[in-house]
Curated annotation (Swiss-Prot):
GO terms for biological process: detoxification of arsenic-containing substance; response to arsenic-containing substance. Keywords: Mitochondrion, Oxidoreductase, Repeat, Transit peptide. This is Protein HIGH ARSENIC CONTENT 1, mitochondrial. Arsenate reductase critical for arsenic tolerance. Reduces arsenate to arsenite in the root, facilitating efflux of arsenic back into the soil to limit both its accumulation in the root and transport to the shoot. Essential for arsenite efflux from the root, but not necessary for arsenate uptake. Disruption phenotype: Reduced arsenate resistance and increased accumulation of arsenic in shoots and roots. The gene is HAC1. Induction: Up-regulated by arsenate and down-regulated by arsenite.
Protein backbone atom coordinates (compact mmCIF):
# COMPACT_ATOMS: atom_id res chain seq x y z
CA UNK A 1 0.00 0.00 0.00
CA UNK A 2 1.40 3.36 -1.00
CA UNK A 3 0.81 6.68 0.67
CA UNK A 4 0.44 9.56 -1.74
CA UNK A 5 1.89 12.91 -0.86
CA UNK A 6 -0.69 15.20 -2.42
CA UNK A 7 0.85 18.61 -2.65
CA UNK A 8 -0.58 21.57 -4.44
CA UNK A 9 1.61 22.07 -7.51
CA UNK A 10 1.34 25.81 -7.18
CA UNK A 11 3.11 25.60 -3.82
CA UNK A 12 5.74 23.02 -4.71
CA UNK A 13 7.04 24.72 -7.86
CA UNK A 14 10.18 26.76 -7.42
CA UNK A 15 9.77 30.47 -7.00
CA UNK A 16 9.78 32.44 -10.24
CA UNK A 17 12.94 34.45 -10.68
CA UNK A 18 11.93 38.09 -11.20
CA UNK A 19 13.83 41.27 -11.65
CA UNK A 20 12.58 44.78 -11.13
CA UNK A 21 12.57 47.37 -13.85
CA UNK A 22 11.42 50.97 -13.81
CA UNK A 23 9.17 52.28 -16.58
CA UNK A 24 10.77 55.71 -16.93
CA UNK A 25 7.96 57.11 -19.09
CA UNK A 26 5.40 56.59 -16.33
CA UNK A 27 7.66 56.23 -13.29
CA UNK A 28 6.17 52.84 -12.29
CA UNK A 29 8.18 49.96 -10.91
CA UNK A 30 7.42 46.87 -12.98
CA UNK A 31 8.37 43.22 -12.51
CA UNK A 32 9.78 41.35 -15.46
CA UNK A 33 9.69 37.56 -15.36
CA UNK A 34 12.65 35.69 -16.80
CA UNK A 35 11.86 32.87 -19.24
CA UNK A 36 11.53 29.52 -17.50
CA UNK A 37 14.17 26.83 -17.95
CA UNK A 38 14.35 23.09 -17.24
CA UNK A 39 15.56 23.98 -13.72
CA UNK A 40 12.19 25.67 -13.08
CA UNK A 41 10.21 22.52 -13.87
CA UNK A 42 8.79 20.62 -10.92
CA UNK A 43 9.29 16.87 -11.28
CA UNK A 44 7.12 14.40 -9.39
CA UNK A 45 7.53 10.64 -9.10
CA UNK A 46 4.95 8.23 -10.51
CA UNK A 47 3.34 7.59 -7.13
CA UNK A 48 2.75 11.29 -6.56
CA UNK A 49 1.53 11.65 -10.16
CA UNK A 50 -0.96 8.81 -9.66
CA UNK A 51 -2.20 10.50 -6.50
CA UNK A 52 -2.60 13.82 -8.33
CA UNK A 53 -4.58 12.11 -11.10
CA UNK A 54 -6.98 10.70 -8.52
CA UNK A 55 -7.68 14.26 -7.34
CA UNK A 56 -8.53 15.67 -10.77
CA UNK A 57 -5.20 16.54 -12.37
CA UNK A 58 -4.99 15.75 -16.10
CA UNK A 59 -2.36 13.53 -17.68
CA UNK A 60 -0.80 15.09 -20.78
CA UNK A 61 1.11 12.45 -22.73
CA UNK A 62 3.60 14.16 -25.05
CA UNK A 63 4.93 10.98 -26.67
CA UNK A 64 4.50 10.37 -30.39
CA UNK A 65 1.22 8.97 -31.67
CA UNK A 66 2.98 5.65 -32.35
CA UNK A 67 4.25 5.38 -28.77
CA UNK A 68 0.85 6.38 -27.42
CA UNK A 69 -0.96 3.79 -29.58
CA UNK A 70 1.07 0.94 -28.04
CA UNK A 71 -0.07 1.71 -24.49
CA UNK A 72 -0.97 4.71 -22.40
CA UNK A 73 -2.59 5.94 -19.21
CA UNK A 74 -6.35 5.69 -19.44
CA UNK A 75 -8.03 9.00 -20.33
CA UNK A 76 -4.68 10.61 -21.16
CA UNK A 77 -4.52 13.52 -23.55
CA UNK A 78 -2.05 12.77 -26.35
CA UNK A 79 -0.45 15.86 -27.81
CA UNK A 80 3.00 14.98 -29.16
CA UNK A 81 5.75 17.44 -28.27
CA UNK A 82 7.87 16.06 -31.10
CA UNK A 83 7.29 14.14 -34.32
CA UNK A 84 9.56 11.60 -35.97
CA UNK A 85 10.63 12.65 -39.46
CA UNK A 86 13.22 11.41 -41.96
CA UNK A 87 15.58 14.06 -40.55
CA UNK A 88 15.01 12.93 -36.95
CA UNK A 89 12.68 14.32 -34.29
CA UNK A 90 11.29 17.82 -34.74
CA UNK A 91 9.27 19.88 -32.28
CA UNK A 92 5.54 19.97 -33.00
CA UNK A 93 5.03 23.59 -34.14
CA UNK A 94 1.38 23.44 -33.05
CA UNK A 95 2.02 21.94 -29.60
CA UNK A 96 1.00 25.00 -27.57
CA UNK A 97 -2.09 25.78 -29.65
CA UNK A 98 -3.17 22.13 -29.47
CA UNK A 99 -2.78 22.13 -25.69
CA UNK A 100 -4.70 25.43 -25.50
CA UNK A 101 -7.56 23.86 -27.47
CA UNK A 102 -8.18 21.27 -24.73
CA UNK A 103 -6.58 22.63 -21.52
CA UNK A 104 -7.08 25.86 -19.60
CA UNK A 105 -4.04 27.68 -18.23
CA UNK A 106 -5.25 27.21 -14.65
CA UNK A 107 -5.68 23.42 -14.96
CA UNK A 108 -3.32 21.10 -13.12
CA UNK A 109 -1.35 19.01 -15.61
CA UNK A 110 0.94 16.03 -15.17
CA UNK A 111 3.15 15.98 -18.28
CA UNK A 112 4.90 12.79 -19.34
CA UNK A 113 6.80 11.32 -22.25
CA UNK A 114 8.56 7.97 -22.33
CA UNK A 115 11.50 8.72 -20.01
CA UNK A 116 11.24 12.36 -18.90
CA UNK A 117 13.28 14.42 -21.38
CA UNK A 118 10.57 15.55 -23.79
CA UNK A 119 8.18 15.97 -20.87
CA UNK A 120 10.46 18.41 -19.08
CA UNK A 121 11.01 20.44 -22.28
CA UNK A 122 7.24 20.49 -22.89
CA UNK A 123 6.78 21.75 -19.32
CA UNK A 124 9.21 24.62 -19.99
CA UNK A 125 7.17 25.68 -23.03
CA UNK A 126 3.91 25.41 -21.06
CA UNK A 127 5.30 27.44 -18.14
CA UNK A 128 6.52 30.13 -20.54
CA UNK A 129 3.07 30.16 -22.16
CA UNK A 130 1.43 30.91 -18.79
CA UNK A 131 0.37 27.47 -17.56
CA UNK A 132 1.04 27.73 -13.83
CA UNK A 133 0.28 24.22 -12.62
CA UNK A 134 2.40 21.79 -14.61
CA UNK A 135 4.69 19.05 -13.37
CA UNK A 136 6.86 16.58 -15.24
CA UNK A 137 6.46 12.94 -14.26
CA UNK A 138 10.00 11.73 -13.61
CA UNK A 139 10.89 8.62 -15.58
CA UNK A 140 7.92 9.12 -17.90
CA UNK A 141 5.58 6.38 -19.00
CA UNK A 142 8.37 3.81 -18.59
CA UNK A 143 8.42 4.52 -14.84
CA UNK A 144 4.61 4.26 -14.80
CA UNK A 145 4.87 0.77 -16.33
CA UNK A 146 7.74 -0.22 -14.01
CA UNK A 147 5.60 0.79 -11.02
CA UNK A 148 2.93 -1.65 -12.19
CA UNK A 149 0.34 1.01 -13.03
CA UNK A 150 -0.09 0.11 -16.72
CA UNK A 151 -3.20 -1.88 -17.46
CA UNK A 152 -3.31 -5.03 -19.55
CA UNK A 153 -6.00 -3.65 -21.85
CA UNK A 154 -5.28 -3.86 -25.57
CA UNK A 155 -4.81 -0.39 -27.11
CA UNK A 156 -8.14 -0.46 -28.97
CA UNK A 157 -9.99 -0.85 -25.66
CA UNK A 158 -8.33 2.14 -24.00
CA UNK A 159 -10.23 5.41 -23.88
CA UNK A 160 -8.53 8.19 -25.78
CA UNK A 161 -9.53 11.64 -24.58
CA UNK A 162 -7.61 13.59 -27.21
CA UNK A 163 -5.21 12.75 -29.99
CA UNK A 164 -3.33 15.04 -32.37
CA UNK A 165 -1.41 14.09 -35.49
CA UNK A 166 1.10 15.94 -37.66
CA UNK A 167 -0.40 17.95 -40.49
CA UNK A 168 -0.50 16.19 -43.85
CA UNK A 169 1.39 18.02 -46.60
Amino acid sequence: MYTYSLLNLSHCRRQTRKKRKTDHTEGFLMEETKPKTVEDVETVDVYTAKGFLSTGHRYLDVRTNEEFAKSHVEEALNIPYMFKTDEGRVINPDFLSQVASVCKKDEHLIVACNAGGRGSRACVDLLNEGYDHVANMGGGYSAWVDAGFAGDKPPEDLKIACKFRPKEN
